Curated annotation (Swiss-Prot):
GO terms for molecular function: ATP binding; tRNA binding; tRNA-uridine 2-sulfurtransferase activity. Residues 150-152, 308-309 are annotated as: Interaction with tRNA. The record marks H129, Q341 as: Interaction with tRNA. Its main location: cytoplasm. This is tRNA-specific 2-thiouridylase MnmA. Residues 99-101 are annotated as: Interaction with target base in tRNA. The active site is at C104 (nucleophile), C200 (cysteine persulfide intermediate). It catalyses: S-sulfanyl-L-cysteinyl-[protein] + uridine(34) in tRNA + AH2 + ATP = 2-thiouridine(34) in tRNA + L-cysteinyl-[protein] + A + AMP + diphosphate + H(+).
């Protein structure tokens, strides 16, 4: 950074939560020219007619006034619908389990928002994500946040070199308790505000009820691979591979799990046992590849991977099939690898990039999760 902090404009995305509030506070204390932006991505009026976005924006206003920075609200509802929510529905329609947070970061927070910030004269954008950016060996590297429990690089795996070059993560070196403490000491209005969880556009609503508003449910048969009927399902879109709860299968013996889907015949396949081999894969084909790092210029390399958020790192070999596809060979079989979810690659603390899980194999045989 060649400019002095006071000459450097940073536009920060503020959600009305404690993380982005403290991120804004830190930037202001470091002397940057800070502007707070509240992104309205969804019309989220709840069942009681209360718009939670309005409440969140009021918290942003209060915090920005406390810190002493200007603020604006920007409406990205159309972009969010077109780029994130439509994708979300398409994936569920195809029987997969999508991760809208990854797409939101790629298309909204680090694209639409970044473009808007640059129009405001921003040198950088910032967010309250738990991640770090470092410039080393001629490229920008995205590193895990130091708080292992909160690290969010999994959701940021599609960011490009260009996006990272204009991004700051003020919370990357901090742990959550420190952030709460800073907010309390500064008297910020959001200091004790509960963290948001789940998918942002669903909020506190029932997932089945929400999804049925957009995709008509198609109940069908729940059966074993040998054809023994075990009950009925409410609609394939409501179940994910490895799911136990909500199947409603009683009886003695090991618990039952969802092990596959047949979209053509609308069948949910189930079987018993947490360690059932039908739930384990050792080879994955993943598409929609995005690379943060230049390491991917190699045709084959070893690294670790996460196949879902908060999962422990797994040793893998990545083979580049083409610019959009990779084959992943796992050192050990991994449970419940789920089509539609993100697989994210790491070299130590560095996030190399990620892709969308498409096909899963075990000992060379394709697991027909989406038969």
């Amino acid at each position: 950074m060649n400019k002095l902090p006071q000459e450097t404009r940073v536009v920060i995305g503020m959600s009305g939560g404690v993380d982005s509030s403290v991120a804004a506070l830190l930037l202001k204390e470091q002397g940057y020219d800070v502007i707070g932006i509240f992104m309205k991505n969804w019309d989220d009026t709840d069942a009681n007619g209360v718009c939670t976005a309005t409440e969140d924006y009021n918290d942003v206003i209060e915090v920005c006034n406390q810190i002493g920075i200007p603020y604006y609200a920007v409406n990205f509802e159309k972009q969010y619908w077109d780029k994130v929510f439509t994708y979300f529905l398409d994936e569920y329609r195809a029987g997969r389990t999508p991760n809208p947070d990854v797409m939101c970061n790629k298309e909204i927070k680090f694209k639409a928002f970044l473009e808007h910030a640059i129009a405001l004269g921003a040198d950088y954008v910032a967010t309250g994500h738990y991640a770090r950016v470092a410039y080393m060996d001629g490229e920008y590297k995205m590193l895990r946040g130091v708080d292992d429990n909160k690290d969010q690089t999994y959701f940021l795996n599609q960011l490009s070199q260009e996006q990272l070059s204009k991004t700051m993560f003020p919370l990357g070196e901090l742990k959550k308790p420190q952030i709460r403490e800073m907010a309390t000491e500064a008297g910020l209005a959001t200091a004790a505000k509960k963290d948001s969880t789940g998918i942002c556009f669903i909020g506190e609503r029932n997932f089945k009820d929400f999804l049925s508003n957009y995709l008509p449910a198609q109940p069908g048969v729940m059966q074993t691979l040998s054809g023994e009927v075990k009950g009925k399902h409410d609609g394939l879109m409501y179940y994910t591979i490895g799911q136990r709860h909500g199947l409603g299968i009683g009886g003695n013996g090991d618990p039952w799990f969802a092990v596959g889907k047949n979209l053509k015949e609308n069948i949910l396949y189930v079987d018993q046992g947490f360690h059932n081999e039908l739930l384990y894969g050792d080879e994955v084909i993943a598409t929609n590849v995005g690379w943060v790092s230049n390491k991917a210029k190699e045709k084959e390399f070893t690294c670790t991977a996460k196949f879902r958020y908060r999962q422990a790192d797994n040793k893998v070999t990545v083979q580049i099939v083409d610019e959009n596809t990779v084959r992943i060979l796992c050192d050990e079989p991994i449970r419940a690898i789920t089509p539609g979810q993100a697989v994210v690659f790491y070299d130590g603390d560095e996030c190399l990039g990620g892709a969308t899980i498409d096909e899963v194999y075990h000992s060379g045989k394709k697991l027909d999760y989406l038969g």
